[in-house]
Amino acid sequence: MKKHYLLTIMALVLAIMPAWGAMYMVGNAPFGDWNPGNGVEMTDQGNGTYTFTTSISGTVWFVFADGQSSDWNIFNANYRYGPSSGGSQEVTVGNTYSTSKSNNNHSYKFTGTGKDYIFTFNLSSLTFSIAEYQEPQLPNPFDLPAGDVNGDGEINIADITMLVDIMLGGFANYDTRHRSDVNHDKEINITDVTVLVDYLLGGTLPQRVKEGYDYVWDDEAIPEVHLSVSLDEWNRLLSLYDANAYTTQYVMATATFVKDGETTVIDSVGLRLKGNTSRRRPEGGHGQMHQRDNTDWHHAHFGVNLRKYVDDDAHTIQGVRKIHLKWFKDDPAYVREVFCYELFKRAGVWTALRDNYCRLWIHVEGDSREAYYGVYELMEPIDKRYLKDRKDRFGASDGYLWKCRNAAAGLNNPGGDIWYDDDSDDRHTYTLETQTDEFDNARAQLIDFMNKLSNLSDSEFYTWIQEVTDVDLLLRTYAVNVAVGMWDDYWNNANNYYIYFNGKETSGYQFFFIPYDYDNTLGTSLRCGVQDDAGRHNPLQWGNDNNRLIARILKFSDFKAKYVLYLKELVEARNALMDRRSAQARIRAWQERIAPYIDNDTGEDTVIEDKPASWGNHSEYNLLETGSDNFFNAKAASINALP
C-alpha cells in the first residue's frame, strides 16, 4: 500500500550578495538532521511531515501538496502559497520537471524572486536540495537537415509518417515545413516522400543549390566582403563626410566576395556611407586624412553599388547589383535586425528584405594589410531590383516605390515634403525611388492615396482598403512589427518604411507596405510617440492614431480580430516563431556562429552581450534569460492579455 505524504516546504532559500548580486541557494540537507551550513532548519512534525525553515532570510513560505510517494504530480496537488510572516515575494509552483524516473527521486520547478528553481527530494535517502533551474535548450534549428521532418536528429520511417501527415493537412511550423521540402523545390508533395524512401533504401539526399539572391543571402554561410580603395578615393570619402555627414556620393573601389571557396572580384564599384542617426566617419576625426600607421578605424555603414561606374553583367554577384553593409550599432547582442527579418520570413511576410551575416575587410592602397572591420549585416537594398526579384508577388515591378522617413511620414500630410531621388544629399520625407521621370504622376497618386486614407467615411474606407491592398498581409506585417517592439515605425513615429504602388493610376493599383530598419528592437526601448515600453505596451494602442493606416483598419472588428490572432500565433510555442524558447535557440545558434569573428581592428563592439542599447529606457530587458525581464516573456504576456 502506497504511503501518503504531506510535505511542507518553507522556502525562500535565497540571499543576495550585494557586491555581485549572486544568489545563494540551499544545498543538500537531510530529513531529520539540521545542517547549519545550509542555513536551513528542519523540524519533524510527525506523521511523515517535515518543515524546512531558512535562516538566510526572514521571509518564510509554505507550499502544501498531497500525492503518492511514487508519483507526486504537482498538477493534481492540493497546493497554496503565502508567507508565514512578513515577506513580499511570491513563490509559484510551476510545471513539473523530472530529473529522474526513479520512484524515490522527484524534482519540481517553482518560481521565486524572478527566477526559476528546482526543489528535489529523495524518499529513500530522505534528502532534499534546491538549485537554480537550468532549462533544457532546444536544438539548433539550423543544424537539422532536410528530411529530418520531426527534428529528432535522425532520418527514418517516422519522418515519412510525419511528412505524409503534413501532406494530408497536419500541423507543421516553419522549421518542420522547411525540413519537409526534401528535394528543395519549395513545395511539399509526394516527390519528397519518394526521395525519403529512396534515401532509406540506400540512396542519397539532394543538396540545395543556391543561385542568384539565394547565393548571396545564404543563411548557412558567412561570406567575406573585401573592399579595396585607392588612397585618393578613401580620402575623398572622408572629405565628403566632413562636408556633409549625410552625403550620398560614391567613391570608386574594388569589391571581392568570397563564399564556399568561390571568389568573385569586381573592379570599379561604387562605395558610399549610409545610415541616419548612425552615420559615422569610418576613420579618424574631422579633417583628418588617412593615417597609414596607427590608423583610427571606426565602424560605419556602407553601401556598395557594383554597377555604379560600369553597367554590364560582369559587375554583379550572380545578378545582385547592390549590397548594404551595416554594423551592429547599439546592438551588443549582434542579433536584433537579423532576428526580425528572419521572423518576417517565418511569418509569411514576403515583402521583408533579405538579411544575413558577413565579414568585412577594407584595404586602403599602400597599407601593409587589410583592416578587419568584423561581423556586419549583409542587407538587400530596397530598390528596383528588389521589386523585380518579387515581380510575381507584386504583380508588376515598374510601379512607384517611395522611401518614407524623417519621423514625419504619417501618410496624413499631402502638403508635406514629397520629392524624388535626384542623387543629391537632401533627405525628403517621401522620396520617389523608381520611375523618377514620372514624378508628377507618382506624386498625384500618393496624394490621392493620403486623401482617401484620411477622408473616406468608415464604410467607404472598409471597401476601399480591401480593394487597394492585401489587408491580411498588412496585418501580418504589423503584427511582427509590434511583436518585436519596433517603436521607431510608421504607426508610432511616422518613420522607417517603404511603400509601393504597382500601378500608375489613382485607382486599380495595389499598395504594399514594406518594413524597414529593425535594429532598435527586442528590448531596445525609448520614450517616443505614445509609448515608453516597447515590451509591455498595449499592442492595440501601439501608435499615434493620426498616422491613420493601421488605426483605421483596426477600428473594424474583423480586421482587429485577425491582427490579434496573428500576434498570438507569433508567441504560441508550437509555431516556433517568437516564443521565448524557440527564439533563444535561433539567437544562440547565430551567436555561436559569429562569436569567433567578433574581435576586429576598430576595437569596437568586440564582445557579444545580452543587453539592449545603452541609451534605451528599459535596461532590464534581456534575450537569453528566463524571467519576467526577458523581452520575449514580457511581449508574450502583453499579447496574451489581449481579449
Residue ranges and their predicted role:
Residues W297, H301-D313, Q318-Y334, A347-L353, ...:
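Internal "kinase-insert"/substrate-recognition segments embedded within catalytic cores
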Residues V209-F339:
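Conserved NTP-binding catalytic cores of kinases and kinase-like/nucleotidyltransferase enzymes
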Residues Q137-V209:
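Cellulosome-associated attachment modules in secreted, modular CAZymes
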Residues T8-M17:
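Bacterial N-terminal signal peptides
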Residues D71-L123:
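Structured interaction patches on ligand/partner-binding surfaces of diverse proteins
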Residues A22-T59, G67-V91:
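Aromatic-rich carbohydrate-binding modules that target alpha-glucans
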Residues D214, E220-I222, E233, R281, ...:
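Middle-to-C-terminal accessory/interaction subdomains
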